[in-house]
Structures are given as C-alpha cells and as structure tokens.
Amino acid sequence: MAHPSQLGFQDAASPVMEELLHFHDHALMIVLLISTLVLYIIVAMVSTKLTNMYILDSQEIEIVWTVLPAVILILIALPSLRILYLMDEINDPHLTIKAMGHQWYWSYEYTDYEDLGFDSYMVPTQDLVPGQFRLLETDHRMVVPVESPIRVLVSAEDVLHSWAVPSLGVKMDAVPGRLNQTAFIASRPGVFYGQCSEICGANHSFMPIVVEAVPLEHFEKWSTMMLEDA
C-alpha cells in the first residue's frame, strides 16, 4: 500500500499491474532520451558560434525528424495496445462480484451465491483500532480468493463513482443505469486499499475500498460464515 513520502507506485499485486509498471518504465526511458536529446540540441544551438544563413532546406533533416518520431510513437503504442487488450480480456472468471456505488459507500453482491451481499462503510476515525489506517478502513471487506480470475461488475445508484484499487491495476467508472466490468487476479494474499476516484459529492473522500485476498480454503470458510449470518 501507499506510505508517507512515497515517490513510486504501490507494489503490484496482479499480473496486469506488473505489466503497467513495466510499461511505465519503458515509456519513462523513452521520454528521458527525448528530453536529453532536445536539451542537448538547445544548448548546442545557443552556445555555438557557427551559423549558416544560407540554408533554406535540408532533405536529410526533414526525413530524420519525420521518421524518428514515427518510430518512437510505434515503440510506445505497441506495448500500450497489448496491455489495453490484456485489461479488457475476461476469460472464464471463477467469481463475479457486483460493486454498486452510493453516496457515500459501496455495496457488494456475490452473484455466484444465492444470498451473499453487504454494504461497506468507512470506519470512523474514533472507531479505529491499532494497525488500521485512517480514511482507508471499512467495516466489511471485499474478500476474494488468490490466483483466481475475478470479474467485477461496476455500477452506481445515484451519481458517478469510480471503483479503483491501484495495487491490483483496476479502475472502472460506476455510472448510474450502466453496468461496466473489469477483472483482476490477485497474485498474492494481502489487503489492498483503494478509494472512489470520481468526485461524487461532499463525502467523496470518505468511501474507501478494501479488497482482501485470501487462500481458497479461507475464502470458502468466509463465504460459508457470511451465508449462515445472512
């Protein structure tokens, strides 16, 4: 999760997020090389005493500054498109969860079960216990099994919201009257935090998201307990 004075991304907890981090490093290196080249040319043009007032055109330079940007754009676009298709692909999900945004909390419904659903509210600061995080804890976590494809159907009951968990590399808009979907695979057990990422009113910053990834046997025990309590 995020920590004070953090400069980089959160640790990846899904294959898609790992791909996004690799693409970020790839694009950053290209931007760094371009910036270095442009800075060198600017310094060279300003500092040199050599000038030629009679050059009207240069076929070689025009070819270079046309072909080189095209190659750079291709080097950025191809891996970007690959990740885009990976994020959009949902093959044989083992579990489907419907996340519904409200002002200002989330509700979850496990559609593969007959009666498994709950509301998830932020834990007030005065009710926190040692080890919990202010503005990030919820009274009910969305529990999922690790190493399993999870599909999340996202919508909203009132206004625009956005369901986002950075460590899992997922962010999907919740639009009233529209059912969007996203998917992820939690590659390791853990607790992953997110927040509503679309301004939705006065308490927009007080509707956190908590995803807890557990081994399959623990998930089965949790789901059985939730069904018994329903």
UniProtKB/Swiss-Prot annotation:
Binds a dinuclear copper A center per subunit. It comes from the Eukaryota. Residues 1-14, 88-230 are mitochondrial intermembrane. The keyword Cell membrane does not apply. Its cofactor is Cu cation. Mg(2+) binds at residue 198. It is an enzyme of class 7 (translocase). Its EC number is 7.1.1.9. It is found in: Mitochondrion inner membrane. GO terms for cellular component: mitochondrial inner membrane; respiratory chain complex IV. Its main location: mitochondrion. It is a multi-pass membrane protein. Component of the cytochrome c oxidase (complex IV, CIV), a multisubunit enzyme composed of 14 subunits. The complex is composed of a catalytic core of 3 subunits MT-CO1, MT-CO2 and MT-CO3, encoded in the mitochondrial DNA, and 11 supernumerary subunits COX4I, COX5A, COX5B, COX6A, COX6B, COX6C, COX7A, COX7B, COX7C, COX8 and NDUFA4, which are encoded in the nuclear genome. Belongs to the cytochrome c oxidase subunit 2 family. This is Cytochrome c oxidase subunit 2. The gene is mt-co2.
